[in-house]
Amino acid sequence: LCDAHMHVESGMVTVTEFARAVIPHGTTSMFIDPHEIANVLGLPGVKLMHDEAMGLPINIWVQMPSCVPSAPGLEHAGAELGVEDVAAAMQWPNICGLGEMMNFPGVAAGDARMLGEIAATQMAGKTVGGHYASPDLGPAFHAYVAGGPADDHEGTRKEDAIARVRQGMRAMLRLGSAWYDVATQVKAITEDGLDSRNFILCTDDSHSGTLVNDGHMNRVVRHAIAQGLKPITAIQMATLNTAQHFGMERELGSIAPGRRADMILTSDLAALPVELVMARGEVLAENGALQADIAPYPYPDFARGTVHMGKQLSAGDFDVEAPAG
């Protein structure tokens, strides 16, 4: 199973520990956007997570974060990334594209920096991730899509999913710890008959408790089936559709000669119990238990102690005075 868009940092764990948590649930590929570490450590932080991901037994591709900082002038970020940084990162082996382009007003208005980041990604032949968090599906949305983003996961309504597909995007339907957008948007397939090949499943953000108690992409697929999708269609939306979107269908997304031997064994396509997990031909988990020996990643000193409060805190700093009377 593939997670087409997600942020490891939402789990409050490292890439290695996240992989350890999701492998028993059948996840063998992830497309991560390390936006949070980019806001703190800049390009070296992104490279750190990229290199950590490359050493793991499942496929983890990195989307180079865009819009760093995410709200210029409204926050004190630890770093700022520009077009040159994006262009440089596109040469790294495990970079699959540009992370979600959150500055949708800027793209629609022709902001030079945003369009430059998109152009650098497209020149490298990679995929531009979208983030259009607005109910306005008129000219502003059309201008945003024309700017280059190829997918979007911010839809919450059936009409959002329909609009994205009609404009040539892939609609990513997310079920995470705080996002419950599959049920409403999947109706574009089950009710309106849109081609399911233009839809992809993802999580976006999963807290550690969700991973432990509920699962990962297996949870999303089960939920999609419960909303009326045929099991094989829901599975396709978490495998082959994702691979094709990122131009990796010759490597993954299907069980066929020449592909990576990433697969799960299950006795029930609808209930989807994950009984065995293989990645690159190696058994990594069986009956919910991790079998692979995955060593912790040694984070360097520069990645530690990055919270700077400006002063030494005391208990009194957390006092809240009651108003008089």
What are these regions (language model features)?
Residues H5-E9, H35-I37, P65-S70, M101-F104, ...:
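Active-site beta-loop-alpha junctions enriched in small/polar residues
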